[in-house]
């Protein structure tokens, strides 16, 4: 049997970047996830930092993490950032908090993760995610 294959020279498109959204307030998490999906991102959701660690340990592909700072569980957002620096040093994280100055100070001390102050608009979030992602893919 002689089958003819139609092979294209066009590059295979890359999958959209995957954002792990870590937020304990389900309504906030749902809105963020929906906006990011509409903006062309794949999204994985976690209700707290402990759940985020389990997602990452399961081997689910994640390109960047967007996490609230104040959450219940054994880790908060800063603890998650420290865990990522230790266990997944190439994985970017952006933190968000309503207490911006205190969060920035703590971030500088423990994880050096950028902080997006609440309230933020979705366009700013998308821009920051894309900027951090392009930083990792630039030569």
Q: What annotation goes with each model-predicted range?
A:
Residues 45-64, 104-105:
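Acidic, metal-coordinating helix/loop segments flanking the phosphotransfer/catalytic sites
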Residues 48, 75-80:
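Acidic catalytic/metal-coordinating carboxylates
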Residues 30-38:
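Charged docking surfaces used in two-component/phosphorelay signaling
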Residues 68-69:
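Active-site residues of response regulator receiver
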Residues 25-29, 72:
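Short acidic/polar segment at the start of the alpha1 helix of CheY-like receiver
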Residues 1-20, 26, 33, 51, ...:
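Non-catalytic signal-transmission and effector/linker regions of two-component phosphorelay proteins
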Residues 99-103:
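Negatively charged, flexible loop motifs adjacent to catalytic sites
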């Amino acid at each position: 049997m002689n089958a003819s294959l139609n092979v294209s020279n066009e590059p295979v498109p890359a999958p959209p970047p995957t954002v792990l959204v870590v937020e304990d307030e389900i309504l906030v998490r749902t809105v963020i996830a929906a906006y990011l999906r509409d903006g062309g991102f794949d999204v994985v959701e976690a209700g707290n930092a402990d759940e985020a660690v389990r997602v990452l340990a399961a081997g689910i592909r994640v390109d960047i993490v967007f996490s609230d700072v104040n959450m219940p569980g054994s880790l908060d957002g800063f603890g998650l950032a420290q865990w990522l620096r230790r266990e997944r040093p190439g994985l970017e994280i952006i933190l968000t908090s309503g207490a911006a100055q205190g969060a920035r100070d703590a971030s500088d001390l423990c994880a050096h993760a950028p902080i997006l102050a609440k309230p933020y608009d979705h366009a700013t979030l998308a821009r920051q995610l894309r900027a951090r992602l392009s930083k990792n893919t630039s030569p």
